[in-house]
C-alpha cells in the first residue's frame, strides 16, 4: 500500500493499454508507482467486473523478498510526487484511512491470496 500526499491510502493499480496484456500493465504500473522493476513471475489471482461500473480489474500476486517495512518513491506523474510505501498484513482489516474502493479491493483480494498461498 502507499500513501499519496493528496489522495490518501492507495494500492498500485492502473489502466491496461490497448497494446498490452493485463500482466504487462500490472508490471508497468508497479514500476511507475513504486520503482520496482521485476522480471519475476506475476501470479494471476482474479478478475472482477464489479469494483467500478464499466471497468475490469485484474489481480496479481508477486512473491517479493523485502528487507524494509517502509520505503518512498518519487513518481513523475502529476508534476512529481513522493509516495510513501508500507506493507499491510494480509489478514488485517483495511486501514481506517483507506478509501472505500481500496477497502473493497483488499476485501476481494484477501481470499484470493489466501487460496494462492494455501493459508
Give each language-model segment a name.
Residues 49-74, 86-91, 105-112:
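Active-site-adjacent beta-strand/loop module that shapes the phosphate/pyrophosphate-binding cleft
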Residues 7, 40, 56-58:
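A generic structural signal for short beta-strands and their flanking turns/coil linkers
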Residues 13-14, 48, 93:
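Conserved short-loop catalytic and cofactor-binding motifs
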Residues 1-12:
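N-terminal strand-loop-strand
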Residues 7-9, 76-119:
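Nudix hydrolase/Nudix homology domain
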Residues 11-44:
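The catalytic Nudix box helix
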Residues 2, 45, 88:
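Hydrophobic residues at beta-strand termini and immediately following loops
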Amino acid at each position: 500500500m502507499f500513501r499519496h500526499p493528496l489522495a490518501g491510502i492507495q494500492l498500485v493499480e492502473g489502466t491496461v493499454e490497448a497494446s498490452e496484456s493485463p500482466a504487462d500493465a500490472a508490471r508497468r504500473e508497479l514500476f511507475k508507482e513504486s520503482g520496482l522493476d521485476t522480471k519475476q513471475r506475476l501470479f494471476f489471482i482474479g478478475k472482477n467486473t464489479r469494483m467500478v461500473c464499466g471497468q475490469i480489474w485484474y489481480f496479481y500476486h508477486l512473491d517479493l523478498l523485502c528487507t524494509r517495512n517502509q520505503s518512498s518513491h518519487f513518481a513523475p506523474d502529476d508534476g512529481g510526487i513522493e509516495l510513501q510505501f508500507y506493507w499491510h498484513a494480509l489478514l488485517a482489516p483495511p486501514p481506517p484511512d483507506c478509501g472505500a474502493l481500496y477497502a473493497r479491493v483488499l476485501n476481494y483480494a484477501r481470499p484470493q491470496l489466501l487460496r494462492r498461498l494455501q493459508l
